[in-house]
């Protein structure tokens, strides 16, 4: 619809609103619906026309008017509430004198109404409500998108989510499913004896991940602060304090780019288990994902963007190096060693920075040639120590850590490891991160002296993991973009 036409309709609706104000309040707030459309349909759809007439069942409903057909003294209206739609049958003889012509006919699609009436079935067999009383609860001034074209512009859907939710059942179902998944995850960890906690969103030192933070300033304390990039270091402080199993579901903030898989503000669950290993967490994660598929989606086989993801089978487990060799059959193990890795990467078209060590080069090769090919649930293990500043070194090979990442449909969904609890080793790794930051890497970590102090009190052997809730919801709702599963995703400034 052109802006000019839209503005004309808005002016017309404002004129109707002025007339409605003269005869009453077009924003009534004392109507209490007792029924939902979908509940009514589920309970009474099996009744015959005669059975409904005998039952004389009165219901009351409130919602948005999505269709209105005036046929003289009779009108048909479709009302949509949070559960679905139902048809209303409105006749002038059931309403107060002159109400039908002077008020009801001035109502528009998009208005919010409340109605009381008796259930019946039309001659076509559609379950409907024969109205005894109907009220305007909110007059809508902006017209909804046309019923045939709906709201198809993706950018408008993201910017005006309120309209998207009105018009698109798929969007409504996506966010209902998101809520179900988060509740399921919370119950899953409660059932496994984890304690839910809350840690600071504003931090004096942003830690727990390699990412660029958002900065702010605390006026009363007269100090710079940062929106957290991860709760990890605070959750591990709780492990040190004796809380052996903790989890947190909350927002993280990373001052990075936008993509179909990245939003600067996103939801994660992080959880930590004392006396556990990264193997324990892989087992727990596999159980969690399989349970979500079965209990929330109804099947261990979940279709995502045309691919059948099998959550019933045991998830594949393979190391970083072995996965590179598997998906690059022309390479051999020595192509990835200290002597040859840089040349191998350059042959693959990867630009190498001078300060990169072997571990960073191997990860770049992995991300370039392997990551997007990991369709089925796969744990990638044995990440290099160089790119794992908070993970425990492997006992047999200090070049690698006891770390994994879970990939599904070519996307990283989870990251976990046995935690580094050697305070001296952690201090040295923090120092290396600071050196990288001084060289211009603004995603490197800060030195967190208080966390080192906490580690010096002793942290028990611990494993921890973070799972991206938004990406997980993408999988279980078949959503191609992270913006489809975040109610109000970040967008570039709107061009007026």
Swiss-Prot record:
Q: Does the keyword Cytoplasm apply?
A: yes
Kindly give the Pfam families that the UniProt entry links to this protein: tRNA-synt_2, tRNA_anti-codon
Q: Which UniProt keywords apply?
A: Aminoacyl-tRNA synthetase, ATP-binding, Cytoplasm, Ligase, Magnesium, Metal-binding, Nucleotide-binding, Protein biosynthesis
For this record, the Gene Ontology CC terms, alphabetical, are:
cytosol
Identify the cofactor(s).
Mg(2+)
Q: Which InterPro entries match?
A: Aa-tRNA-synt_II, aa-tRNA-synth_II, aa-tRNA-synth_II/BPL/LPL, Lys-tRNA-ligase_II, Lys-tRNA-ligase_II_N, Lys-tRNA-synth_II_C, NA-bd_OB-fold, NA-bd_OB_tRNA
Q: Does the keyword Protein biosynthesis apply?
A: yes
Q: Which Gene3D superfamilies match?
A: Bira Bifunctional Protein, Domain 2, Nucleic acid-binding proteins
List the PROSITE patterns hit by this protein, alphabetically. AA_TRNA_LIGASE_II
Catalytic reactions of this protein: tRNA(Lys) + L-lysine + ATP = L-lysyl-tRNA(Lys) + AMP + diphosphate
**Single biological process term from Gene Ontology:** lysyl-tRNA aminoacylation
Q: How is the cofactor bound?
A: Binds 3 Mg(2+) ions per subunit.
Binding positions for Mg(2+) 2 per the UniProt entry: 412
**Residues that, per the record, bind Mg(2+) 1:** 405, 412
Q: Where in the cell is it found?
A: Cytoplasm
EC numbers on record:
6.1.1.6
Q: Which domain of life is it from?
A: Bacteria
Note the subunit structure. Homodimer.
* Family label: Belongs to the class-II aminoacyl-tRNA synthetase family.
What's the name of the protein? Lysine--tRNA ligase
Q: Which organism is it from?
A: Vesicomyosocius okutanii subsp. Calyptogena okutanii (strain HA)
